[in-house]
Amino acid sequence: MKIKFKKNDEVIVIAGSHKGKTGRIVKVDINNNTAIVKDINIVTKHVKPGQGNDGSIKKMEAPIHVSNLSILVKKATKTSPAQFSKIGYKFDKDNKKVRILRKTKKEI
């Protein structure tokens, strides 16, 4: 499965316990088809004490599968919900492959 998301894309979670939340992609893992989204899917990680450092409890973002994410077109307002779209590809005049929003046909 090809991952069409890139780092710093603004995405919305479309499925799961964090459905409807928006954020920016921090990291994309192409091997596991997952992405880490800033301030979404926060988990606590217990770090064992070792030589030279103390044990601690850290909060960090856990990865989300890319099938549960969609690119954000327009943020939600009081009167309208957030709009999101799938990502497609097309070739421009110079024969370069560019990413487009499938709903609006605009380049990203």
UniProtKB/Swiss-Prot annotation:
The family line of this record is: Belongs to the universal ribosomal protein uL24 family.
One of the entry's Gene Ontology molecular-function terms is: structural constituent of ribosome
Top-rank taxon, per record: Bacteria
Q: Which CDD domains match?
A: KOW_RPL26 (cd06089)
Which Gene3D superfamilies does this chain map to?
A: 2.30.30.30
Q: Which UniProt keywords apply?
A: Ribonucleoprotein, Ribosomal protein, RNA-binding, rRNA-binding
Q: What GO terms describe the biological role, i.e. biological process, of this protein?
A: translation
- The name under which this protein is listed is Large ribosomal subunit protein uL24
List all membrane-crossing ranges: none
**Which GO cellular component term is one of those annotated?**
ribonucleoprotein complex
A Pfam family found in this protein is: KOW
| HAMAP family named among the record's database cross-references | Ribosomal_uL24_B
Query: SUPFAM superfamilies in the record, alphabetically?
Result: Translation proteins SH3-like domain (SSF50104)
Known partners and oligomeric status? Part of the 50S ribosomal subunit.
What's this protein's function?
One of two assembly initiator proteins, it binds directly to the 5'-end of the 23S rRNA, where it nucleates assembly of the 50S subunit.
